[in-house]
Amino acid sequence: MKRKKSSRRSQAGFSLIELLIVVAIIGILAAVAAPRLLNYLKLGRETATINSLRTIHQNEATFSATRARFGTLKELQEFGLLDPNYANGAGVSGFVYNSPEATADKYCVQATRQTETTANRDFNVIEDGTIRYVEAKSPAPIPHGEGTPLSDTGGTTTPGAAPAAQPPKS
């Protein structure tokens, strides 16, 4: 009896060259898609931050209606208007929030990105509800009302809550 020699060609599977081609194609697709994905993640974090600043502005109006002045993030949190993560500097969605200024007639809440890879801009909101952004990483607090308003880029200012009543001018 003659035995047939089994040929490697009859075995099922992929050759090494076929696998290398598939890996190369996947690598090319990943190299093209990764930067876009990272930009979408940054945009998502920025959008979440803008929405948080809008909510904080509305909470400031609620606080000032009862206290006749604006509050710090810590005071808003103690008043039950804000999640503790915003007030304790823990960071939310890659941004750290602080309120360097809160008086009877003005406030400023800032959202500073934790790293350069978190987002492309830092944000702040002041008593009139205008949310502004600063492109350069802010090493120190952003001065009151400094930055480009989102409305200059097609965004909107925060509707709704009005600022605290202004004291009478003498």
Segments the model singles out, each with a brief description of its role:
Residues 1-14:
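N-terminal leader/signal peptides at the extreme start of proteins
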Residues 20-36:
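Alpha-helical hydrophobic helix detector
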Residues 36-53:
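Aliphatic-rich helix starts adjacent to a transmembrane/signal segment
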Residues 138-141:
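A short acidic/small-residue loop/turn micro-motif
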